[in-house]
């Protein structure tokens, strides 16, 4: 997006991806080459995802997806991938009540396909079939986060 478009002063809503970045990637294959042998059943895949965001400067937010994917077969860990993938978003002239949903739903939704591809490539480069993570309902994650924050604030005020 052109600098003049980001810095418009006419009050039009602005939502722009300024940059995306890979902050951290770890792939562990602790039992290789034994873990690469053909298996009779699919491994158990455990996926944990977290979304964090921090304001940086005026109207910019650093949004970070943290994914941890662990594949195991019985008691053996086949692989463990950890990824931290982020983006900086420019959000301006958006009503305040819409900013946090935009930051915690739309921003991670835009980042997710890139993070998903990195994890797929890492598992394939590690000698396993590519792992395609199913799409994630970031709206549900945001609603859960809001409900937990409300519950915690009620607990603290009691």
Curated annotation (Swiss-Prot):
Pfam families: SecB (PF02556). Belongs to the SecB family. InterPro entries: SecB (IPR003708), SecB-like_sf (IPR035958). It comes from Bartonella henselae (strain ATCC 49882 / DSM 28221 / CCUG 30454 / Houston 1). Its main location: cytoplasm. GO terms for cellular component: cytoplasm. One of the proteins required for the normal export of preproteins out of the cell cytoplasm. It is a molecular chaperone that binds to a subset of precursor proteins, maintaining them in a translocation-competent state. It also specifically binds to its receptor SecA. HAMAP family: SecB (MF_00821). One of its GO terms (molecular function) is unfolded protein binding. Keywords: Chaperone, Cytoplasm, Protein transport, Translocation, Transport. The keyword Chaperone applies. This is Protein-export protein SecB. Transmembrane segments: none annotated. SUPFAM superfamilies: SecB-like. The gene is secB. GO terms for biological process: protein folding; protein tetramerization; protein transport. Homotetramer, a dimer of dimers. One homotetramer interacts with 1 SecA dimer. It is found in: Cytoplasm.
